[in-house]
Amino acid sequence: MLAPKKMVRGNYSMVTEFILLGLTDRPELQPLLFVLFLVIYLITVGGNLGMMVLIRIDSRLHTPMYYFLASLSCLDLCYSTNVTPKMLVNFLSEKKTISYAACLVQCYFFIAMVITEYYMLAVMAYDRYMAICNPLLYSSKMSKGVCVRLIAGPYIYGFLSGLMETMWTYRLTFCGSNIINHFYCADPPLIRLSCSDTFIKETSMFVVAGFNLSNSLFIILISYLFILIAILRMRSAEGRRKAFSTCGSHLVAVTVFYGTLFCMYVRPPTDKSVEQSKIIAVFYTFVSPMLNPIIYSLRNKDVKHAFWKLVRRNVLSK
């Protein structure tokens, strides 16, 4: 194992780079994992970029619901890209290191985009509430200006929260081991490596994660409570079917994303929890961003129509 590179500050040395252990230390599995996660990443990039392109070029998809979906696709793409390239390089490299600065940057974007996605999913639930419970007021209430603010709000709040959390991480001192038992720079394993008092950082992490997780989930649950009441009051079976169909994809995405993150953050950073968090992290870092475009397009006639329209246009142009 490589010795930690250190920078002398005062009477002690500071770690200037970390070693990422990754998912496994078995060398025979590294090439297989490289191929697996490369395929997942290519599907993620293709699916989310494709969703954004379809929404951009098809006028039928220029509605609030699809603007929010395009924003979610952008988040998922950035979310996965923050971790995957470095992880793929490490699968084929003997030197699985990441600099202290790069580690902080990865931490920052991870936290920022997780919190942003919390509230983007909440915004999408609110949009469904407005469409189903207030259909006559939907166009006026969900104007272009309102949509821009509803998209910008989660981004601004998420990236400011990420900056605050990263500043607390920056204040930690790392002067011992530099081995991170994870495949990316995550707060729990970093906290375990710190040789300074981590109480403030741990408290901040649990408060911020707990508040944003519960607050955004509360918005989603309240929105769907009113949606359920509105659906049960519908006399038309076809109307109820369409309403459930509209909400089904979002509910699946919410369950996958929130379920895995809830398991991740409600536990203290112990040896066992870090090992478990690596498995859980695979789902929300790779599986969820890959599945979201599929989930949202599988039963969506508008998206499928836009896709085949684009395919026919390209085929006929040749």
UniProtKB/Swiss-Prot annotation:
Disulfide bonds: 103-195
One cellular-component annotation, GO: membrane
Subcellular localization: Cell membrane
Topology Extracellular: residue spans: 1-31, 82-105, 161-202, 265-277
One example of a Gene Ontology biological process annotation: G protein-coupled receptor signaling pathway
Mitochondrion listed as a keyword: no
Pfam families in the record: 7tm_4
Molecular function in Gene Ontology: G protein-coupled receptor activity; olfactory receptor activity
Keyword Cell membrane: yes
Glycosylation sites: 11
Membrane topology summary: Multi-pass membrane protein
Transmembrane segments: 32-52, 61-81, 106-126, 140-160, 203-223, 244-264, 278-298
Family under the similarity heading: Belongs to the G-protein coupled receptor 1 family.
Known function: Potential odorant receptor.
Protein name from the UniProt record: Olfactory receptor 5M5
Species in which this protein is naturally found: Mus musculus (Mouse)
Top-level taxonomy: Eukaryota, Metazoa, Chordata, Craniata, Vertebrata
